[in-house]
Amino acid sequence: MVMSNISSIGTNYYSQIASGSKLQSAADGAAQMSIVQGEKGQINGYDMAARNAQDGIGVLNVADGAYNSITESLQRMRELAVQASNTAVLSDGDRRAIQYEVDQLKQGISDIANNTEFNTKKLLDGSNSDMYIQTGANAGQGQRIDTGNATLQALGLADFDVTKDFDIQTIDDALAQVSSNRSSIGAQSNSLDYTIGYNTQTSYNLTKTVSQMEDTDIAKAVSEMNKKQLLNTVNFMMQKKQQENQRQRMNLLF
């Protein structure tokens, strides 16, 4: 029986060395194993949350790139509006020609606003301006991102026409709105970047803690296994000697 127990202990150390984990079953420490499994769940949660936040930054980068193109179009529209304001020199035909380019720019802005998307989700038409990202390991730990609305209606440019009464301030207001949206996107991106760093560091710290609780101390395990194997050998030899002595006593009796 003793020999069996020693052999079992030696086998357990061998399993620890082979697997790298000193927690082979609940018998090795039910409470500690429960803690380790719980922390592993948290580690996986923080890792996934970091990836979610990175996806969120991807969404914001796409939106910001689209706003950059819209800004260039608005700046050109402003140049044309200033040109069209020179009524002392320009004819109605000249202003109509300018309006033709303005209309092309407006159509380009509309196309960007209605077609910019990330994984099939529209980003600048106002339909998905408030999106939720799970940025923490647990329920309720998330962040909402807003990419704004860049449609002509939202920018106040739907009826902008330099052949009629118009105000250059209308384009300045649109530029200010786009600039505000881009500033918001930058702030949200920075927040997500901070979250990625926090999640990554927390995951690393928890991984170290779990490693200390779970990983086998190879040198100690080998030493203990050798001790148990030596005890097993000694016990075997003692049993063999006892059996030999018994046989000798029996021979003397008969």
Where are these regions (language model features)?
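Proline-poor, low-complexity alpha-helical tail modules
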Residues: M1-S21, S203-F254
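Amphipathic, heptad-repeat-like alpha-helical segments
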Residues: V2, V62-I70, S91, N190-G197, ...
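Polar, low-complexity export/assembly segments characteristic of proteins
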Residues: M3, I17, D111-I185, N190
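Structural signature of extracellular appendage/secretion-system components
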Residues: S19-Q104, S110-G126, G186, V210-M213
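Residue-level signature of catalytic and energy-coupling elements of molecular machines
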Residues: Q32, I109, I145, N235
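Alpha-helical coiled-coil/heptad-repeat oligomerization segments
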Residues: S34-Q37, E79-L80, L175, D193, ...
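Type III/flagellar export substrates
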Residues: K164-T233
